[in-house]
């Protein structure tokens, strides 16, 4: 199952107030629900409700950084939306955010039945996270109520947690093969692109779009600093060797 999440731009998200980089891989995925009935199962209807979630989280006291969830999934359609995404720490599961991702079912899964499409999307999303190195190969899928005094993620979602977990063989630990170093990778215009950029992005945990932009350069600097290398945001022979030959 190939997932193409609806982007934040498409669902008209407000920009985050701030972001906190998530450490990876995490070993927990928590399932939530919005606890609000969803009557319009079109993309525009789901997006409207997701925007209301974001406004609600913005208006918390103290205010939250963004919509709390990493990803959101339509209760009937199974359509996937990007929340904070893989790169940023979620804010939905108190005391667990530093070691988990949060997936929210858009709707109320006690008063509404979660669909097989939604279950399949959650399972595929988790498998994608493992394959890309964001989720550890050994992980736990839990409901919010397992770690907090709440009815979340609703009854029909909670009853299907086992179905949301990918089977062994459906997921595999990421294997990053070192692409050869040709030109030095650096931030410039036109942007540098290609397989090597994707390999770098997989290592540093930035968006895997294959484009060496500001976020990737920033991720490389953080990676270089943590590995006691010269911090310049450039992938040259030393950084390339350390990044791909470390194991």
Where are the predicted features?
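Glycan-recognition patch characteristic of GH18 chitinases/ENGases
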Residues: 44-60, 64-66, 72
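Short, charged early-sequence alpha-helical segments and their helix-coil boundaries
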Residues: 230-241
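Acidic, glycine-anchored loop motifs typical of Ca2+
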Residues: 156, 210, 214, 233
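Short capping motifs at secondary-structure boundaries
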Residues: 204-205, 226-229, 247
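Acidic, Ser/Thr/Pro/Gly-enriched interdomain connector segments
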Residues: 169-214
């Amino acid at each position: 199952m190939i997932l193409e999440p609806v982007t934040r731009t498409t669902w008209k998200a407000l920009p985050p107030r701030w972001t906190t980089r998530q450490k990876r891989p995490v070993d927990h995925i928590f399932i939530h629900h919005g606890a609000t009935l969803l009557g319009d199962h079109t993309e525009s209807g789901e997006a409207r409700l997701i925007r209301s979630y974001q406004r609600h989280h913005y208006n918390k006291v103290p205010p939250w950084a963004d919509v709390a969830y990493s990803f959101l999934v339509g209760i009937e359609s199974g359509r996937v939306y990007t929340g904070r995404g893989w790169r940023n720490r979620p804010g939905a599961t108190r005391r667990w955010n530093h070691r988990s991702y949060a997936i929210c079912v858009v709707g109320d899964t006690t008063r509404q039945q979660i669909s097989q499409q939604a279950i399949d999307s959650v399972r595929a999303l988790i498998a994608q996270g493992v394959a890309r190195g964001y989720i550890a190969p050994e992980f736990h899928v839990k409901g919010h109520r397992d770690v907090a005094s709440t009815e979340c993620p609703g009854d029909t979602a909670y009853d299907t947690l086992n179905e949301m977990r990918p089977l062994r063989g459906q997921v595999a630990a990421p294997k990053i093969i070192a692409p050869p170093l040709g030109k030095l990778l650096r931030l410039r215009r036109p942007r540098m692109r290609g397989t090597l950029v994707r390999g770098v992005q997989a290592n540093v945990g930035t968006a895997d779009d294959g484009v060496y932009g500001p976020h990737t350069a920033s991720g490389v600097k953080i990676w270089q600093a943590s590995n006691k290398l010269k911090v310049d945001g450039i992938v040259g022979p030393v950084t390339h060797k350390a990044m791909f030959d470390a194991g």
